[in-house]
Amino acid sequence: MLNDTTGLRAAAIPAAAPDRGFGRFVTVRTGIPRSASERLLRGVGWSAAGCVIGQSASFAGSVVAARCLGKEGFGQFALVQTTVAAFSTLASLGLGTTTLKFVSEYRTSNPQKAGIILGLSSLAAFVAAALFSAALVLCAPWLAVGRASAPILTAAMRLSALYMFFTTVNGYQMGALSGLEAFRGIACINVAYGLATLVLTWAASRWFGLCGATLAQGLSAALLWLLYHYALKAECRLRNIVVTYCGVWKERPALYRFSVPSTTACLIASLAVWWSNAALARASGYAQLAVFSAVNNMRLIVLFVPLIIGRVTTPLLNNMLAAGDLWGYRKTFCGSVALSGSTGILAATVLALAGRYFLHLFGKEFTGSSALILLLLSAATLEVIASSLYQAVFAGSSLWRQVVINAVWTVVLVATLQLTVSRHGVSALAFSYLAAWGSSVILYGAEAWRRLKQLELRRSQTLEKTLCNP
C-alpha cells in the first residue's frame, strides 16, 4: 500500500540481485515496478507467515466452538459475532482506514502530523468504544433474535461488549501499523493472537458453553490490544513519530473528510450482514445459520491470500500517489488486481472440490448442499475482485462513492434475500451474496477505470510541462 520503505532497517535487508530473483519474476509477470515488487513481496511474505498460523488457529477455534456448542449453539454464536461486528463498525468511526491512509501519507514527509493523527485516532477510538459497548449491554435483550434460548443469548450479547470494546480500539492500531508497513510485527502478533484464541475458545466453550465462547473472544481481543499497543510504540519510536494530543482539534477535518464516509459505508454493509443472518435465523432457525457460518469459513479461506495482498498494497499505492509516482501506481494497482483475482479463483476451485469433506470438520450434523457451497464460493471470488478494485477508490479522495456502492450492495443483498429466503433457506443467503458482489464488481470496475483514466491524463500533462519547460 509506499515510496520510502523502512530506511532505518535497510542495512539489515540484503540488496536484491539486479537481474534475478522472485522480485524480478513478479515485476515481469505483473508489470509492478521492481522496487514496489520487492516491498510487496516482503510485506506479503511476513503477512502470510503470520496469517497462516494465526488464521489456522482461528479456524481451528471455530471448529472447536462448533463441536463444543453443537449446531444450535454455534448458530447463536454466529449471530452474536455478526451483531458485534455491526456495532463495532459503527463505533470504529472508520479510524482504521483513516489512520492507515494518513500515516502512510505523512510518516516520511510530515512525522509531526502523523503523530497528531495517531493521537486524535486513539482518543476518538477509546471514547467511541466505551459509549458503544455500554449501548450494546443495554440493547442486548432487543438484539437477541428468536424465541429459543433467549436468556442465554441475551447474556452472551452482553458479554460480547468486552470483545467489541477492544475490537474498536484495535482498529486504529492495526491501521497505523499497516500504514507504517510494520508487517513483520503484525505477523508475530497474529500468531500469538490466533493461538491464544484457540486455547481460550476450547477451554471456555467446553466448560461454560455459549457465554464462555463469547468471553473467550473478548479476552483474546484484550490480549491483541496489548500486543498492538507495544508494537505501535516501538514503530513510532523507530520512525521518530511522537504521538501527541496537542493540536488534535485542528486535524478534525481528517475525520470529517475520510472517517465519516468510511464509517457510513462500513455501517451500511455491516447492518445488512446482521439483518441477513437474523432473517435466516427467523426463517429457518439457528441450525441453518450454523451451517451457513461453517460454509462461510470456506469463503474466508478464499479471501485469505487476496486480503494479505490488499493489506500490503493499499499503503504502498497510497504512498506512491502521494509521491507523484503515477506510472508505478497504475502498474502496481493492475498487478495487484490480477494477482488477487487469480489466487482467489484458484482457492475457490480447490475448495469446491473438497467442500463436503470440509464441512465434516465441524461435526457430523453439519451438512450443506453442493449448491450452497458453489454459490458462496462464487460470491467469494467476486468479493476478491471487488475488494481489489476498491483500492482505486481508497487511494483517491472519493470515499463517498464507496458509500453509494455499498448502498447498492446492501439493497441487492436485502431485496434478493427477502424474495428467496422463505423458499430456499440457507442457499438463498448465499445467492443473495453472489448477486450483491456481482453488482459491486461492476460499480468498482467502472470507478477504477475512471480513476486510472484521470491519472493517465495527469501523467500526460506532467510530461508535457516537463518537455515544454526543460
PLM regions: where:
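Signature of the first transmembrane helix
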Residues: D4, A15-R24, A36-T97, S133, ...
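Interhelical loop/hinge segments that connect adjacent transmembrane helices in multipass membrane
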Residues: G23-L40, Y228-V273, G324-W327, R451-P470
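Transmembrane helical elements of multi-pass membrane transporters/channels
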Residues: R42-F59, Y193, T197, A213, ...
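Helix-loop junctions and terminal segments of transmembrane helices
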Residues: L93-T108, G179, R237-N240, V295, ...
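Membrane-interface junctions at transmembrane-helix termini in multi-pass inner-membrane proteins
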Residues: F165-C188, S378-V408
